[in-house]
UniProtKB/Swiss-Prot annotation:
Family: Belongs to the ATPase alpha/beta chains family.
Biased composition (Basic and acidic residues): 1-12
Lineage: Bacteria, Bacillati, Actinomycetota, Actinomycetes, Mycobacteriales
Annotated GO MF terms: ATP binding; ATP hydrolysis activity; proton-transporting ATP synthase activity, rotational mechanism
EC numbers for this chain: 7.1.2.2
Protein name as annotated: ATP synthase subunit beta
Length: 486
């Protein structure tokens, strides 16, 4: 439940505590402020400074990061500090940064401070919640485990997602993480009518604009709130934008009792921004130059993403993997919090299989007979066994050729190639590029189709019939067009 300390006292933005200080030092986004003795603002308090730059008046928001002693506080600016000089008056608001919450945030774009970007001034009269909040108490957590059906074959069969869980999309640059997130927003809105909150953390501004346009064209913008802190923003903004979006999602969960989907693109940029802030604050770096507080900062975010009794926040997070190195501390720290991982592979991508999920590297904690059922588990394990054996045979095939394999292995390779192609699927997010409508396959049909495929029922069907299609009906049509019958 929400405590009064975590809400603002009234609608609108928090007001002043009538305590003012003055700027004594500006170093990029780091601003040192001196306050009167006995009036030092608390950590995470928001401070406001009125400045004029190039004839434009604006209000800078600073967040208290450190107490330096001698009545000095060190703050991080959430906007560019151009025009800020020594001696400028700084007002302590008496509260932390807060964002608007409520049904009205859907269909709009906000920044990390809660300012509406598509309609300036919108949302100022809404109730505001602090972005720094405690996770739900242990006794409030939902004990049941339930699968979230997506309609994507490769996900539902091999890496089933947990309702109210944390799911990560791992991959290097350009393998389709953002496209898969857009696909999930489409599917959740169309198939379940659920509320989605999207956090754009340190990614390209162009992608944010494209997402806004595509959601509007797909008629799902009305069910989605977007919060952006793009890569041209100061590190303080990129570090806080995920918390701002999560706070909006928590309102839908706690006050409306809804199941909410929270999309974060990209969680690596959250870590990267924290590293920049840590360096600016003069902290000693840890492994590979990351901040010493990496695990703590990640935990503060991830522990708030959870299910309470009867309602949930399901999180899907894109994770950029630097240089495709999974031992890097940023993706490695994220692993500890996840219920399912979907790894997008450059090798699969190069085959033209989309979504480019590596079925052998992806995993889920609920791929277990006690959760998904014996039949689902059996079929998934058989698919994995065939694909793993095919991978083991790759070197032999490359050196000696497929003709040197035993008849049993030849048959297995042929089935594995069909399975690989059948794991591809036409997606809603790619309709405008492919001209093919996206398909949704019920999990029961997915299990039946792959069970028959593993048993050899489709050995006579050409490989290309399995490529970028939906379920069994699509397979029958494609096979017939190629002169085969199921």
């Amino acid at each position: 439940m929400t405590t009064t300390a975590e809400k603002t006292d009234r609608p609108g933005k928090p007001g002043s505590s009538d305590t003012s200080g003055r700027v004594v030092r500006v170093t990029g986004p780091v601003v040192d402020v001196e306050f009167p003795r006995g009036s030092i603002p608390e950590l995470f308090n928001a401070l406001h400074a009125e400045i004029t730059f190039e004839s434009l008046a604006k209000t800078l928001t600073l967040e208290v990061a450190q107490h330096l002693g001698d009545n000095l506080v060190r703050t991080i600016s959430l906007q560019p500090t151009d025009g800020l000089v020594r001696g400028v008056e700084v007002i302590d608001t008496g509260r932390s940064i807060s964002v608007p919450v409520g049904e009205g945030v859907k269909g709009h774009v906000f920044n990390a401070l809660g300012d509406c970007l598509d309609e300036p001034g919108y949302g100022e009269k809404f109730e505001h919640w602090s972005i720094h909040r405690k996770p739900p108490a242990f006794e409030e957590l939902e004990p049941r485990t339930e699968m979230l059906e997506t309609g994507l074959k490769v996900v539902d069969l091999l890496t089933p997602y947990v309702r109210g869980g944390k799911i990560a999309l791992f991959g290097g640059a350009g393998v389709g993480k953002t496209v898969l997130i857009q696909e999930m927003i489409n599917r959740i809105a169309r198939n379940f009518g659920g509320t989605s909150v999207f956090a754009g953390v340190g990614e390209r501004t162009r992608e944010g604009n494209d997402l806004w346009v595509e959601l509007a064209e797909a008629n799902v913008l009305k069910d989605t709130a977007l919060v952006f802190g793009q890569m041209d923003e100061p590190p303080g903004t990129r570090m806080r934008v995920a918390l701002s979006a999560l706070t909006m999602a928590e309102w839908f969960r706690d006050e409306q009792g809804q199941d909410v989907l929270l999309f974060i693109d990209n969680i690596f940029r959250f870590t990267q921004a924290g590293s920049e802030v840590s360096t600016l604050l003069g902290r000693m770096p840890s492994a590979v130059g990351y901040q010493p507080t990496l695990a703590d900062e990640m935990g503060e975010l991830q522990e708030r993403i959870t299910s309470t009794r009867g309602r949930s926040i399901t999180s899907m997070q894109a994770v950029y993997v630097p240089a495709d190195d999974y031992t890097d501390p940023a993706p490695a720290t994220t692993f500890a919090h996840l219920d399912a991982t979907t790894e997008l592979s450059r090798a699969v991508f190069s085959k033209g299989i989309f979504p480019a999920v590596d079925p052998l590297a992806s995993s889920s904690t609920i791929l277990d007979p006690s959760v998904v059922g014996d039949e689902h588990y059996r079929v998934a394990q058989e698919v994995i066994r065939i694909l793993q054996r095919y991978k083991d045979l790759q070197d032999i095939i490359a050196i000696l050729g497929i003709d040197e394999l035993s008849e049993e292995d030849k048959q297995l390779v042929n089935r594995a190639r069909r399975i690989e192609r059948f794991l591809s699927q036409n997606m809603m997010a790619a309709e405008q590029f492919t001209g093919q409508p996206g398909s949704t396959v019920p999990v029961k049909e997915t299990i039946e189709a792959f069970d028959r495929l593993c048993k050899g029922d489709f050995d006579h069907v050409p490989e290309q019939a399995f490529f970028l299609i939906g379920g069994l009906d699509d397979l029958a049509k494609k096979a017939e067009s190629l002169g085969a019958k199921l």
